[in-house]
């Protein structure tokens, strides 16, 4: 696994890439909205994801459920392969969504998975040199 971290006070300070697929949460905070808007124009296919604990499923694009055991098949039907470039917008996604997606992407041998997270502006790191 290769982990590369970038820091900036705004999205414009970060390296720009193009992705084939993005997975976003259904967030309503300004940080969520800003992070999702930052992906516009950089992604070919964007899907919103919300974990439904009572059904043990992901609600996709606020339209249909995909059971957690069927997520790999769903991703393959989207066209995701081991060579796909994928970004998870982790500001708006919850832990359950991230975990289910990461497990399915790992099982599909996807190597090009990035994560975007916008921390609240008032966060102050005590040790900025330690990750």
Question: What are these model-derived regions, one by one?
Answer:
Residues 1-85, 96-131:
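Long, low-complexity, Lys/Arg-enriched
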Residues 87-92:
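Short N-terminal targeting/anchoring amphipathic segment
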């Amino acid at each position: 696994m290769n982990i590369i971290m970038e820091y900036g006070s705004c999205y414009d300070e970060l390296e720009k890439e193009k992705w084939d697929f993005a997975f976003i949460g259904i967030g309503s905070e300004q940080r969520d909205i800003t992070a999702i808007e930052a992906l516009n124009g950089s992604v070919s296919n964007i899907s919103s994801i919300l974990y439904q604990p009572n059904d043990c499923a992901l609600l996709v694009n606020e339209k249909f459920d995909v059971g957690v055991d069927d997520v790999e098949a769903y991703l393959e039907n989207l066209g995701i392969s081991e060579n796909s470039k994928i970004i998870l917008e982790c500001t708006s996604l919850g832990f359950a969504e991230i975990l289910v997606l990461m497990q399915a992407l790992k099982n599909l041998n996807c190597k090009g998975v990035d994560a975007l997270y916008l921390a609240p502006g008032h966060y102050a790191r005590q040790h900025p040199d330690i990750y």
